Amino acid sequence: MTDIAPDTGVLDDVVSAFQIENLPVRGRVVRLGAAIDEVLTRHDYPEPVANLLGEACALAALVGSSLKFEGRLIVQAQGDGPVRYVVVDYDTSGGLRGYCRFDPEEVAAVSEGFVRPGAKTLLGGGVFIMTLDQGPDMDRYQGVTPIEGETLALCAEQYFAQSEQTPTRVRLAVGQADTGQGATWRAGGILIQVIAGDQARGETQDAWTHVQALFETTGEDELIDPTVSTPTLLWRLFNEDGVRLLDEKPLKAFCRCSEDRIGVVMDSFSAEEVAEMVEPDGKIHVTCEYCSRIYKLDPPGA
């Protein structure tokens, strides 16, 4: 652990854990540059949909980086609004992938008059879900809460309040920055939580109220500003109390799709179903929903 001081070094595609000195509050900060740009540009979604997926990626990294096992965290929301479904898959190696299903005309209609339509506007009524997948031989744990609040951050706070009973605050941001070589996507986020049972650091409620007041000063622009590093951001927020930077975890855009995985799926179809899938070139074309890669495969048994 190291004490934080302002610096000028900026590191993207990393999630960092931190601890407020002498207070029962900890947190994490995520900064996404090239990784989120790769995830979002693979799909070429309308801006409101890309913003929603970017927020979900930042949230998945914030929560998933705390897992103590090798596996995956799946963050998803599904509703009856213009965006039917958003899902992000985070694996504990730091890989991120995600996609959305939506109606383009409905997204365009609800976006009129909004600077940026939020999660509730885009998703409508539905549920917010987090799933912990510890591997093929382990049971999955899944928590489900209603979509409440206009932002995905509020959905996450509600999830932690109901499913984990852990006081939690989340702020997420997504935007585009001009790097001199055209606009690129960026995303960022910050999460703070009470450390349960940590009486040695003082009265929990007073500390939580104090840290929340500092947290509220976080600007969304700071979370995605390519010139503001994580140490600088934390120094701005918490330097009066003292803050320690703990471990950092690198992040990357990564999809687990492969010809072998698709082949396993194809083996589950009947010969008649496979025949209907064959294109004029004699191949079966399969597009991965996560990364948009197109596979052209020989029919099983060909």
From Swiss-Prot:
GO terms for biological process: protein refolding. The keyword Cytoplasm applies. Pfam families: HSP33 (PF01430). InterPro entries: Heat_shock_Hsp33, Heat_shock_Hsp33_C, Heat_shock_Hsp33_N, Hsp33_helix_hairpin_bin_dom_sf. GO terms for cellular component: cytoplasm. One of its GO terms (molecular function) is unfolded protein binding. Its main location: cytoplasm. Disulfide bonds join 255-257, 288-291. It is found in: Cytoplasm. Belongs to the HSP33 family. This is 33 kDa chaperonin.
